[in-house]
Amino acid sequence: MSRNRNVIGRNVARFRYQRGWSQERLAAKLQLLGCYMTRHIIANIETRRCVVTDVQIEFFTEVFGVDVGELFPQKRSLLQSM
């Protein structure tokens, strides 16, 4: 399976690590906000194995308390990751 299905996975993992959250804890926090998410889905997002919807992106910004632009890599690192 391709690992280039999203560009925000690495930053999702980074923000999660910064907060000391497990994938299960992040999934639970997202579920409390109304976003269906499991540890397995989080793992696939972080390893860039699945597409992330615009609605999921909104939930990630809310749960992490960041602007949407912070989820996306800088242009230079985006080009290097492809």
Where are these regions (language model features)?
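Helix-turn-helix DNA-binding elements, focusing on the entry/boundary residues of the two helices
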Residues: V12, Q23, R39, D54-I57
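Short, solvent-exposed alpha-helical "recognition" segments
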Residues: Y36, R49-V52, L79
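Residue-level detection of the helix-turn-helix DNA-binding "recognition helix"
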Residues: Y17, Q31-L32, T47-R49, R76
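DNA major-groove recognition helix of helix-turn-helix/homeodomain DNA-binding modules
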Residues: R49, T53-E70
